[in-house]
């Protein structure tokens, strides 16, 4: 039984007699063999072979007795069991140091003969240093005889055959896997082609879509740019006018100050004689001057904070301006819809005009606020300039006082006037701060007004949508009435007795039905509207509808509409239950003809445009609710002539048969 401890290539330095040293890589194997015949013992086998030369073979078998003699000869400090590991450590150090220019450990194979043939050789492990080469271990290796070489070659051949078999098996597996991968590759190529085609079509669609969106966005950006340029030019003109006014005021102020300066110089020359007497007062004046300087510094700080606040307010006003511009754009978009119904619904136009006026008023107020804020900032700048000028005047006066050391009574009065001016400027600054606070409150109020206008716009949008739905429903009812009238005129009419007709009509109302003023409730918009005669009589009296009077066959069907508004939470059941409505007959002579829409308004026009944006307060009871009844309805004697179509607004409700 053998245990392989080490088996790898090691760098080796070969030395032969009368030959140059050469470096080769030799495969070294270290095995620990256990022999139990006749006595159990362990032997250490060291073997050197060359992969390029199969006949190169050196062996060394070290038993425990041999190791003891070796230990005694070379002064080793390890036991037989620890010797293999220490020897392997030395070999690893030799391989690690081999790549260096000056290796610390060397592995040498020294032969006393000229050629490594059948002569023994010594394997030395040498440590090099600048002083001496120390040999840590020297082992004598014997060359292998023919039997050992044949045995070694047979083992190598056996290993190579086993390796060949394993490689053949791995080759077969690799070929199978290659075939499978080729098949999968072909399938994946097909899938890839499909995906490429789909991706190409998808990318083409996306490019077209994005190009269209890009053109739309470019147009919007150009419109916004033109609008912003106009606003910028207007603001620029206003600022130029304001700056010119400021320059004119400053020039006037400069002329006044120059005149005052001349007057002061004259007074200074007059008061040179009395300056020496006021040296005692000078110290007090200097202390007061320091105090005024501190006050001026505090005023500067407050002024800087006010500038920052003004800048923030300007930003906020700009944001409000952008919001107002967006609202104006939305109002313009809504104008296009309202223009379609301008002829029929004047009240909606008035509401829209009111909203536009409110928006314009808000914009004008914002412009005024911006102008006031700019004027306040200009006033603050003026105050800063005045303070700087006052400081310069004070410095010049102090220099003149130090040079002349005299101050006149008139100069004391001048200082008092300057202090009064400073106090006035402080008061002006306080007033400016209060006005800024007031303007902030006004801006907040304007913002609340803007929010209220936005809410009103949203409510008007919802109202327009509801009115559109109501108008479409009314158009549908008018078309149905026209169809019923045509069918009544074309079909053969029967004239039952008037008593039975009136009884039939009057008996069509059930006392338990949910009828509110003869109007159905529209479930989506919450607006009550009258039921057309065709709808009510088709659902309630499908077989008993007849004309009351046959003396007016050409008068046509007249429908009365009385638009009123109910609660928006009316259910569909109320609509279904309230479909039958009483139609009392008027016996008054003055109201002999039924009041309502004439037959010419019930004709369907091909060029008609559906009305949109019906307001809730469009029709009032005083203008559009009239006393009248339904005219003579000419119905066919055959009930099958009436088409039974489902309602567009009530999909689940079919006409009763």
Curated annotation (Swiss-Prot):
Which biological processes are named by the entry's GO terms? centriole replication; centrosome duplication; positive regulation of centriole replication; positive regulation of G1/S transition of mitotic cell cycle; positive regulation of spindle assembly; regulation of mitotic spindle organization; spermatogenesis
Its principal location? cytoplasm
Task: Show which residues constitute the signal peptide.
Answer: none
- GO (cellular component) term, any one: centrosome
UniProt PTM: Ubiquitinated by the SCF(FBXW5) E3 ubiquitin-protein ligase complex during S phase, leading to its degradation and preventing centriole reduplication. Ubiquitinated by the anaphase promoting complex/cyclosome (APC/C) E3 ubiquitin-protein ligase complex, leading to its degradation and preventing centriole reduplication.
On the tree of life, the source organism's domain of life is Eukaryota
Task: Please list where the region (Disordered) is annotated.
Answer: 487-510, 615-657
Q: Where in the cell is it found?
A: Cytoplasm, Cytoskeleton, Microtubule organizing center, Centrosome; Cytoplasm, Cytoskeleton, Microtubule organizing center, Centrosome, Centriole
Q: Where is the composition biased (Polar residues)?
A: 492-510, 634-647
UniProt keyword Cell wall biogenesis/degradation, yes or no? no
Per UniProt, what does mutating residue 131 to D do? Fails to multimerize via N-terminus
- Which residues does the record list as Phosphoserine (modified residue)? 510, 615, 657
* Residues annotated as domain PISA: 39-91
Q: Give the keywords, sorted.
A: Cell cycle, Coiled coil, Cytoplasm, Cytoskeleton, Disease variant, Phosphoprotein, Primary microcephaly, Ubl conjugation
Q: Which residues form a coiled coil?
A: 166-471
Record text on subunit structure and interactions: Nine homodimers form a cartwheel structure with an internal diameter of 23 nm and radial spokes connecting to the microtubule triplets. Forms a complex with CPAP and STIL. Interacts with FBXW5. Interacts with NUP62 and TUBG1 at the centrosome. Interacts with CENATAC; the interaction increases with CENATAC acetylation. Interacts with FZR1; the interaction is regulated by CENATAC and leads to SASS6 proteasomal degradation.
Q: What is known of its domains?
A: The 35 nM long coiled-coil domain mediates homodimerization while the globular N-terminus links the dimers at an angle of 40 degrees to form the inner ring.
What is known about what this protein does?
A: Central scaffolding component of the centrioles ensuring their 9-fold symmetry. Required for centrosome biogenesis and duplication: required both for mother-centriole-dependent centriole duplication and deuterosome-dependent centriole amplification in multiciliated cells. Not required for centriole formation in embryonic stem cells but necessary to maintain centriole architecture. Required for the recruitment of STIL to the procentriole and for STIL-mediated centriole amplification. Overexpression results in excess foci-bearing centriolar markers.
Q: Which illness does the annotation name?
A: Microcephaly 14, primary, autosomal recessive: A form of microcephaly, a disease defined as a head circumference more than 3 standard deviations below the age, sex and ethnically matched mean. Brain weight is markedly reduced and the cerebral cortex is disproportionately small.
The protein's name in its UniProt record: Spindle assembly abnormal protein 6 homolog
* Source species: Homo sapiens
Q: What is the lineage of its organism?
A: Eukaryota, Metazoa, Chordata, Craniata, Vertebrata
